[in-house]
């Protein structure tokens, strides 16, 4: 049989040969090159192999086919073919490898004895007939420790405990060492001793013979727990101090935040108060302007603002002539029952307007029945009807320059009109003569 796809032709002859003698460990073989293996010119050499028992591998034995018969006819036929057992022919002699094993456990001879020993069921039962009478209480009669065995308390044993209790009536709480000593003397367990002392203390309490402070634990345990409580108290105090410091820091931070918030609130309140005060002043100004007898209107022409305020005063009117831009012109009208002032001014702040309104109201509150002399030559008759009067025209010429006359007329906040001259010297720039004030007949007599 050959495998050409691997590149190495194999023959049907056996490739592994084992020696019959058990002492031989290796077979002599000649060296062969790779080319010889590829060509297959040289015969297959014998390879060294450990001698195994042929019964283990079962390559050349007929029992293999019978054993494989349980897997079906195809597998049995394949196992019985000549190609499979031809690869591993071994000698029938048992090798020396298994010589160290126990001879009684050989596969054929020892099989019957081993299975017969397994067939005895009695050897594997843990039950023993000699201990049958102790089936349920097998260890009941066995004393494991004579000293630690539980023993009922008698008068002799309890007398020792009573004597110790009478000696320690002020503190009937035995320590652990004393309990162990009493248990050894009375041959009782430690639990019995502790229970007896607990019952004895309870009886003394009922009989009102209690002469000790109520203590629930021994001195050593109390000391140990006292130390633990002290350490816990120190830790608690430290934690309390840390917590207090943290709380103080938190309070300081919260106080700073509160102060900042309060300052911000105060600033906002001040701003609101300023706005409210300004609003109140504006409202009062509007109310005062509405209560005036004459309308107060503000109109802007270009960049100039003309303010017109009605004041109860003599019949004088100061108007701006159309076509005159150099200076103001003064004219008096007898037909108007009020004093109207027209003057150009720039935008004034609110405080100035409030002061102006206050002074205007002060002028308005003055009694209008007091006529003031304007000039020795110009006088008005209070009873003269306005229709019979002619318009009084004041010339443009004045005794001084316009830039100095207007501040004299309007510079005083009280509007001192008594010093306003209606008769002025001729201006050097104009050649027109001065026009005197003319009144109807009978006006000077009044």
UniProtKB/Swiss-Prot annotation:
Residues 256-273 have a biased composition (Acidic residues). Residues 217-226 have a biased composition (Basic and acidic residues). CDD domains: homeodomain (cd00086). One of its GO terms (molecular function) is DNA-binding transcription factor activity, RNA polymerase II-specific. Its main location: nucleus. Residues 146-208 bind DNA. One of its GO terms (biological process) is cell development. Gene3D superfamilies: Homeodomain-like. Keywords: DNA-binding, Homeobox, Nucleus. It comes from the Eukaryota. It holds the Pfam family Homeobox_KN. Residues 208-273, 362-394 are annotated as: Disordered. GO terms for cellular component: chromatin; nucleus. It is found in: Nucleus. Signal peptide: none annotated. Belongs to the TALE/IRO homeobox family. Transcription factor. Binds to the iroquois binding site (IBS) motif of target genes to regulate gene expression; functions as a transcriptional activator or repressor. Modulates expression of RCVRN, VSX1, BHLHE22/BHLHB5 and TACR3/Nk3r. Required downstream of retinal bipolar cell specification for the terminal differentiation of type 2, type 3a and possibly type 6 bipolar cells. This is Iroquois-class homeodomain protein IRX-6.
